[in-house]
């Protein structure tokens, strides 16, 4: 039987529960060790228990008291930015070698977008998965960046209000700050801006994302081809990820410049507009929750690579 790395998930809400189901169904080098929550009545803990996963409703302290804790090598944190700082400190003290995959906007460790820099931080003890909006849009910014210098990138992530749990709602400010920074650090834009919209529409709408970039003038065919290749790469682990329509281009000439607050008063260049839709796999919430699916799929993709590295080191 193939050896697997045991993982614990902190946070038994929407994201944590969806991730658990993905690991149980599709984990190749990762297997569930424990599900951690703070609400003994949470649906996530109840599901985990029914599926034979060790549980605790006593938070990370409870995790350290579980017999399986000694076997845990990877911990996913699907709580909140503030909670992750405390969880990281406590677990790092108890088990310094733990690998933590942070699904909150805390960003203690380096940003990780699997299709852009997924192999760059496999030895880091803590990696940050940015945000759902970041996972959907930063690959597109990077796709433009590898063709032309991007001076400014702005993303708007629209998600169904029903798919946003208390953790997401508590982290709106952190969402915009972390995503904006990652657009620059990982996406390659000189300046980034992120906006999130919680859409209350009924029936719930799928996740929609819009990406605008202002870059140096470049061959639009090359940009379009780069964007399509990147979309295909994301689709390899998020099947519901797709371009909603063809990429649009506008030339902003020097004799008719635009003003971008905080960036420049007389900007010109090539404006690229990319429109995305993310349909979820419906492992936990229905298919409209693509924001859930892209975040947990990216986290699992990252964990599989970390696990491969850990298992290879044991063999060596």
From Swiss-Prot:
Keywords: Aromatic hydrocarbons catabolism, NAD, Oxidoreductase. It comes from Pseudomonas putida (strain ATCC 700007 / DSM 6899 / JCM 31910 / BCRC 17059 / LMG 24140 / F1). This is Acetaldehyde dehydrogenase 1. Belongs to the acetaldehyde dehydrogenase family. The lineage of its organism: Bacteria, Pseudomonadati, Pseudomonadota, Gammaproteobacteria, Pseudomonadales. It is an enzyme of class 1 (oxidoreductase). SMART domains: Semialdhyde_dh. NAD(+) binds at residues 12-15, 163-171, 291. The keyword Oxidoreductase applies. GO terms for molecular function: acetaldehyde dehydrogenase (acetylating) activity; NAD binding. It comes from the Bacteria. It catalyses: acetaldehyde + NAD(+) + CoA = acetyl-CoA + NADH + H(+). GO terms for biological process: catabolic process. InterPro entries: Acetaldehyde_dehydrogenase, Acetylaldehyde_DH_C, NAD(P)-bd_dom_sf, Semialdehyde_DH_NAD-bd. CDD domains: ALDH_C.
């Amino acid at each position: 039987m193939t050896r697997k790395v045991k993982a614990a998930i902190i946070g038994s809400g929407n994201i944590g529960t969806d991730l658990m189901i993905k690991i149980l169904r599709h984990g190749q080098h990762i297997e569930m060790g424990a599900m951690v929550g703070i609400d003994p009545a949470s649906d996530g803990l109840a599901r985990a228990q029914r599926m034979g996963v060790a549980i605790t409703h006593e938070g990370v302290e409870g995790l350290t008291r579980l017999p399986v804790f000694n076997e845990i090598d990877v911990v996913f944190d699907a709580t909140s930015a503030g909670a992750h700082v405390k969880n990281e400190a406590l677990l790092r003290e108890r088990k310094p070698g733990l690998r933590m995959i942070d699904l909150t906007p805390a960003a203690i460790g380096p940003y990780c977008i699997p299709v852009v820099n997924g192999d760059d931080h496999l030895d880091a003890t803590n990696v940050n998965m940015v945000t759902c909006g970041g996972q959907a849009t930063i690959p597109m910014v990077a796709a433009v960046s590898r063709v032309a210098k991007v001076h400014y990138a702005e993303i708007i992530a629209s998600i169904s209000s029903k798919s946003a749990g208390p953790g997401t709602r508590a982290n709106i400010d952190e969402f915009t700050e972390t995503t904006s920074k990652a657009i620059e650090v990982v996406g390659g834009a000189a300046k980034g801006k992120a906006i999130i919209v919680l859409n209350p529409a009924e029936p719930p709408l799928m996740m929609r994302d819009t990406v605008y970039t202002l870059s140096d003038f470049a061959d639009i065919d090359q940009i379009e081809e780069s964007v399509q290749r990147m979309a295909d790469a994301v689709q390899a682990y998020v099947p519901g990820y797709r371009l909603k329509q063809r990429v649009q281009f506008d030339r902003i000439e020097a004799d008719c410049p635009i003003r971008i607050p905080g960036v420049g008063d007389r900007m010109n260049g090539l404006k690229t507009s990319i429109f995305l839709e993310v349909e979820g796999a419906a492992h936990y919430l229905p298919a409209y929750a693509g924001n859930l699916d892209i975040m947990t799929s990216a986290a699992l993709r990252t964990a599989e690579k970390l696990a491969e590295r850990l298992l290879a080191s044991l063999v060596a």
